A protein has these predicted regions:
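Conserved catalytic submotifs in the C-terminal HATPase_c
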Residues: 26-31, 48, 53-63
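Short beta-strand/loop element within the Bergerat-fold HATPase_c
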Residues: 92-104
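Short alpha-helical segment of the dimerization/phosphotransfer core of two-component systems
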Residues: 1-5
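Short conserved segment of the HATPase_c
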Residues: 117-129
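Short helix-loop "hinge" at the ATP-lid/N-box region of the Bergerat-fold HATPase_c
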Residues: 83-84
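Conserved micro-motifs of the catalytic ATP-binding
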Residues: 20-25, 64-67
Length: 183
């Protein structure tokens, strides 16, 4: 299931990044808490394989957004997949996923205890084809499109995304999306 989803994510990444225009979005009403729960369930086995654990705190009382289900699923999957890819080899992975409401928006955060990102690299991580050099620490495959895709999809949904990170402590991605009622 995880492999199938990764293949789908890669395929969508390749397609959408080489189209200059907005991704074609099939917008509909979505309960983001439900969608995120689904991704967490799909991902749980993979995280357990690394002796990791996912804790979720889906506290948004209004989780309803107007969004493209496949693309938002890919965004959540991609950020969680990065947490696995960039985990510390000597430490069990801890993944914290949270939703809440703040000033008319749905907020989503995905936090890990991985290798983290240097401050000077942080502003570049959303650029197309940019990859942080991690040495030979990880068997990380890909095109450096993941976060560029994530950012593009969030922006196409009139949202924002930012990252906070401390080297050797971990990374936290924070997404803000407009609620359906405010869209």
């Amino acid at each position: 299931e995880t492999k199938r989803l990764r293949f789908q994510v890669e395929k969508v990444l390749q397609m959408s990044m080489f189209e200059r225009q907005k991704a074609t979005l099939k917008m509909k009403e979505i309960d983001a808490n439900e969608l995120i729960s689904g991704v967490i369930n799909t991902f749980a086995l993979k995280v357990e394989r690394y002796n990791g654990k996912i804790t979720s705190n889906l506290e948004a009382t209004d989780p309803v957004i107007f969004a493209d289900e496949m693309h938002i699923t890919n965004v959540i999957f991609n950020l969680m997949d990065n947490a696995v890819k960039y985990k510390k080899p000597e430490e069990d992975l801890e993944l914290k996923v949270r939703t809440w409401n703040e000033s008319g928006k749905l907020m989503i955060s995905i936090q890990d205890n991985g290798i983290g990102i240097k401050k000077e690299n942080l502003k570049k991580i959303f650029e197309k084809f940019y990859r942080v050099h991690t040495g030979n620490l990880h068997d990380v495959k890909g095109f450096g499109l993941g976060l560029a895709y994530v950012r593009k999809i969030i922006l196409d949904h009139k949202g924002t995304i930012r990252a906070e990170s401390d080297l050797n402590v971990g990374t936290k991605f924070i997404i803000a999306l407009p609620l359906l009622k405010n869209n």
